[in-house]
Amino acid sequence: YVMLTTKDNVIICDPEDEYSPLVNRLGGQVIRLSPNSRDYVNPLDINLNYSEEENPLALKSDFVLSFCELIMGSKTGLEAIEKTVIDRAVQKIYQPYFADPRPENMPILSDLMAALTAQHIPEADRVAQALDLYVNGSLNFFNHRTTVDIRNRLVCFDIKGLGKNLKK
C-alpha cells in the first residue's frame, strides 16, 4: 500500500525468506546475504546525495561507530579513545573517494582495518582485531564493494543464511 500512495522506498529485512516471492512479483530486488552469497553489500557505501544540512561523512561515521560497538561486543559501549580512533580512520578512508567519487574508490572494511592499524595505538589495534573476522575471517562477505543494485523502490534483504549472531 505504501508504494502505491507515496514515493517512499520500502526496505524489508527478511530473517526467514518469507517475502522473496512477493517482492519478486512486485518487481522488487531481493538481495541474499550469507557467507555463500555472490550478492555483496558494502557496509561502508556512502550516499553523497544528502541535503545541504546533512553531512554524509558524519552520518557514515556514526554508522561505523555503531557497527564497531556491535562487533566489539562491549556491554558498556565504546571508550572515548576507541570512538576517536574510529572516527579518525573513517575520515581518512573516505578522502580518496571524495577526491574521485568512482565506485572502485569506495572504501571497504579492509581499508578501515588498515587505517586503524596505521594509528599504532592499542585502542585502534583492539578495534582492528575485532574487524578481522569481517575482513579476513568467515564473515568476510562484508569486505566487498556492492555488487547489487539497491536503487529499486522495493528492496528485500534475505538474511536467512546469516548465523544467529549476525541477525541481531
Where in this protein do the model-derived segments appear?
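Conserved catalytic segments around the Walker B and adjacent sensor/switch elements
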Residues: 10-12, 29-32
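P-loop NTPase nucleotide-binding module
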Residues: 1-13, 17
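P-loop NTPase motor domains
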Residues: 17-28, 35, 42-168
